[in-house]
């Protein structure tokens, strides 16, 4: 059963999320990237795909969807994850796992470097926000953006007009202690493959790396490789990948 929930961050921003409670003992928190929401078709599919094994909570970051505030491109979004994790803690799950996509992966890595989660999946995570390539002129970028475009979703996006100091995932990745699964596409035009490789090499936790040879960016890795993506992630989350 999926229901909408609203939690509040420590800086008083309301964060909306879809909570799919199936009675599992573990929960997977899903953190979309920039311009993606809990109600984006791709993320509804992702949450549904994992719900056979996990309760899921997919959030709207600040400045997205039904959440309040303005998006700060990973400067403050860890607070949004913190509020959702705190909600999950009250449900007494055996494990709280976190999966982030693109800038959602950046926020997830920052959160996990400070606070406890049981397992972490980072999909197309940037090494440094200022080094994101974002080559929108490439067919792999604009064509997929066009295919996923949802006007209702797009109209909810509210970026901050101010420049905020951002923590670089590169500077904190070695502080993550939970098992972490890095996933990337070799042909990613937005966050090039080297970002994930550098983060993986710098991580000191138990870790694994999966590269899709023909894969591109973030949720597109799921959309183009659905069965393998879900199977690989579940193997990692269940402790079956060393």
Give names to the regions the model predicted:
Residues 64-91:
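Catalytic nucleophile-loop/oxyanion-hole region of alpha/beta-hydrolase
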Residues 115-162:
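Hydrolase active-site cap/lid region
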Residues 34-48:
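The serine-hydrolase catalytic nucleophile loop
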Residues 189-195:
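Conserved alpha/beta-hydrolase "acid-adjacent" motif
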Residues 69, 215-227:
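Catalytic histidine-centered segment of alpha/beta-hydrolase-like enzymes
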Residues 176-177, 182-184, 188:
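Short beta-strand/loop motif that positions the catalytic acidic residue
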Residues 1-22:
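N-terminal cap/lid segment of alpha/beta-hydrolase-fold proteins
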Residues 47-68:
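Conserved alpha/beta-hydrolase
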């Amino acid at each position: 059963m999926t229901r909408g929930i609203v939690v509040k961050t420590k800086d008083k921003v309301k964060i909306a999320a879809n909570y799919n409670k199936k009675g599992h003992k573990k929960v997977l928190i899903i953190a979309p990237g920039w311009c993606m929401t809990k109600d984006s078709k791709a993320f509804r599919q992702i949450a549904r795909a994992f719900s056979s094994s996990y309760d899921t909570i997919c959030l709207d970051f600040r400045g997205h969807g039904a959440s309040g505030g303005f998006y700060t491109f990973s400067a403050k979004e860890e607070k949004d994850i913190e509020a959702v994790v705190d909600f999950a803690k009250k449900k007494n799950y055996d494990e709280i796992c976190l999966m982030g996509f693109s800038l959602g992966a950046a926020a997830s890595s920052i959160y996990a470097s400070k606070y406890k989660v049981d397992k972490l999946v980072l999909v197309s995570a940037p090494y440094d926000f200022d080094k994101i390539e974002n080559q929108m002129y490439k067919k792999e970028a604009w064509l997929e953006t066009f295919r996923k475009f949802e006007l209702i979703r797009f109209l909810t996006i509210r970026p901050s007009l101010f420049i905020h100091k951002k923590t670089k995932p590169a500077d904190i990745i070695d502080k993550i202690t939970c098992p972490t699964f890095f996933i990337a596409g070799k042909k990613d035009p937005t966050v090039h493959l080297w970002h994930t490789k550098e983060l993986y090499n710098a991580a000191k936790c138990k870790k694994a790396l999966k590269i899709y040879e023909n894969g591109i960016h973030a949720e597109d890795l799921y959309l183009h490789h659905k069965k393998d993506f879900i199977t690989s992630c579940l193997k990692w989350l269940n402790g079956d990948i060393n």
